[in-house]
Regions:
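Non-catalytic beta/alpha edge segments that cap or flank active sites
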Residues: 1-159
């Protein structure tokens, strides 16, 4: 059975049609179709309330197993994705953000400026990815190694 996945691009410019959503497309292209079913892919602005409502909708109503967000994890005044994600979480998973920053730092020291978090809300795993397509690709290569096992564990599978 495929892992029900949602892709959430968080970007003022993409949501206004002023920029193409290359990062969301990169995520979708990298998810093997035999393992993941992308059941939702939307673009929303960098707005705290919109982000929290959308994450709750994905988890509570649509019951997706994984939400991959892209954008809004930096230091800009409208970068509120981590705060909105934490607001809806039941449990934090710090190791994911730590490994993404650590491995990304090998390629660019700017990786330490990413504030992305990973959390669980009920049985949904939510992972914040950076906004740049290059950084998304690098992070996806890392998370694809453990994502199916993480989903299995959330649903009662073994360690």
């Amino acid at each position: 059975m495929a892992i029900r996945t949602a892709i959430l691009t968080i970007s003022d410019k993409c949501s206004q049609g002023k920029r193409e959503d290359k990062s969301g497309r990169t995520i979708e292209e990298m998810l093997p179709e035999d393992i993941y079913e992308v059941c939702q892919k939307i673009i929303i602005p960098d707005d705290y309330g919109t982000i929290t409502r959308t994450l709750r909708q994905f988890s509570d109503v649509l019951k997706v197993q994984v939400v991959l967000t892209t954008g809004g994890t930096g230091l800009g005044p409208r970068d509120v994705t981590p705060e909105a994600t934490i607001a809806v979480c039941d449990r934090r998973i710090p190791g994911i953000g730590e490994i993404l920053r650590s491995e990304s730092y090998r390629k660019t020291p700017n990786a330490v400026l990413s504030r992305g978090v990973s959390v669980m809300r009920d049985n949904t795993l939510i992972i914040n990815l950076p906004g740049s397509p290059k950084a998304v690709r690098e992070c996806m290569e890392i998370i694809l190694e453990f994502l199916p096992h993480a989903v299995d564990m959330i649903h009662g599978g073994g360690h």
